[in-house]
Amino acid sequence: MANGEIISGFIAPHPPHLVYGENPPQNEPKSTGGWEQLRWAYERARASIEELKPDVLLVHSPHWITSVGHHFIGVDHLQGRSVDPIFPNLFRFDYSINFDVELSEACCEEGRKAGLVTKMMRNPRFRPDYGTITTLHMIRPQWDIPVVSISANNTPYYLSMEEGLGEMDVLGKATREAILKSGKRAVLLASNTLSHWHFHEEPVPPEDMSKEHPQTKIGYEWDMRMIELMRQGRMEEVFQLLPQFIEEAFAEVKSGAFTWMHAAMQYPNLPAELHGYGTVIGTGNAVVEWNLVKAGLARVAGKAA
């Protein structure tokens, strides 16, 4: 019997400004820095990944939108240049990504068996979205861990929120089943911002941090309320408040990655570790981790079940 398991889950936001601020060699635009609090938060998350030693990273991004079904990348390797459609001045990134096609196919099949519409993406010239790329780079800049990339079907936007997030719950449970059968140790990445109200004019230069602050008072207050509940492990309350949070803070978790991740982890009522919080063009971004190894719910790397 396979002994796959989920070893940790992260809220891992994807503002391209973080890549721009870091100046990796893959990104053509160069900066003088900026958004340090969030970049330092990702440094702490990277240290956790290094300690966990996962076999695979699974990422759900709201910017790979598929209106019909949930799609999974089914190509071994993709390479090319990604240009952010909103911030081409900040993000022109040369990517090279290896995918775990076997696990992607298993997730696709488990989703189909659970009643979802699922599909494998086999186009060898497909260009991954900037959200997927940003999250993956910020969490593991070595790019040495295979990836399962999952699209956003966006059902919470065109069905009722309850129906849409219910479908994401099913997707999460199907993902878990595939991981358990795979024998692999997996980390889940919910590529989401929290409050998503944002500025409409960019400062010059973009990394002028004297211009960076929360766009709305209510958005910031909601972020702090939800983060504090997460830090206390009061996850039942988080999910009870989630619809109101989404409506009042325009929270990007509406796209479903947060629900998908927690459904896959069986909704653990565990205190989260906040690696850091900061705003990007006014939006609220938190790097948050639920480490199932530290909680005794998953094995340490190298230990038998």
From Swiss-Prot:
One of its GO terms (molecular function) is ferrous iron binding. Its cofactor is Fe(2+). Strongly inhibited by CuSO(4), FeCl(3), K(3)[Fe(CN)(6)], AgNO3, HgCl(2) and MnCl(2). Its EC number is 1.13.11.74. Signal peptide: none annotated. It comes from the Bacteria. Keywords: Aromatic hydrocarbons catabolism, Dioxygenase, Iron, Metal-binding, Oxidoreductase. GO terms for biological process: catabolic process. CDD domains: 2A5CPDO_B (cd07372). It catalyses: 2-aminophenol + O2 = 2-aminomuconate 6-semialdehyde. Fe cation binds at H14, H63, H196. Heterotetramer of 2 alpha and 2 beta subunits. Component of the 2-aminophenol 1,6-dioxygenase complex that catalyzes the ring fission of 2-aminophenol to produce 2-aminomuconic 6-semialdehyde. AmnB seems to be the catalytic subunit of the complex. The enzyme is also active toward 2-amino-p-cresol, 6-amino-m-cresol, 2-amino-m-cresol, 2-amino-4,5-dimethylphenol, 2-amino-4-chlorophenol, and catechol. This is 2-aminophenol 1,6-dioxygenase beta subunit. It comes from Pseudomonas sp.
